[in-house]
Structure formats: structure tokens, C-alpha cells
């Protein structure tokens, strides 16, 4: 995974997330949307063949937090949810 920043302003961040596809992109956008300070977030895959594993994201916040802070919070939430799934799986397998 590699992040390539395209545009960075006070409350706006646009970037490519190389090496990912719709699976992680959807998860990240949905998690960002849970944050009340995120006013807009979306991603697009600019070309289905040449850019299939390079979604372009746009994150806009209300100014209370930066887009970078929103992304950090979202990443932490995703990590915690993954841990919960793993723990539930381990518990189910032991039963």
C-alpha cells in the first residue's frame, strides 16, 4: 500500500491509495462517513484497467479536525473492528 497525495488544503485532502481496490476503498469511505467532522468523502477508480488498484480519494472536513486526523481515526477504527472479528472467530473455533 502506498499513498500519493494529489492535493492538500486546510480541510481538503485528495490522494491515491496504490495497491488497493473497491474492497478496502469502500471500507475506508464508510468508516470516514461515521465521523461527524467529515463533510464529504468518496473515491473513484479513474480507469477500470490501468487504475484498477489505485483508487482516488477525496476527504473534506468541517475544520474541527484535519482530513489527515479523520483518516487516522478511521484507520484505528478499521483495525479495532478487524481485531474484534478475529477474536470472535477464535472464540467460535474453540467452541
From Swiss-Prot:
Catalytic activity, reaction form: RNA(n) + a ribonucleoside 5'-triphosphate = RNA(n+1) + diphosphate
Functional note: DNA-dependent RNA polymerase (RNAP) catalyzes the transcription of DNA into RNA using the four ribonucleoside triphosphates as substrates.
Lineage, uppermost ranks: Archaea, Methanobacteriati, Methanobacteriota, Thermococci, Thermococcales
EC number: 2.7.7.6
Alphabetic keyword roster: Cytoplasm, DNA-directed RNA polymerase, Nucleotidyltransferase, Transcription, Transferase
Record has Transferase as a keyword: yes
Top EC category: transferase
Gene this chain is encoded by: rpo11
Compartments reported by the entry: Cytoplasm
Protein name, as recorded: DNA-directed RNA polymerase subunit Rpo11
Assembly and interaction partners: Part of the RNA polymerase complex.
Record-annotated membrane-spanning stretches: none
Pfam families (alphabetical): RNA_pol_L_2 (PF13656)
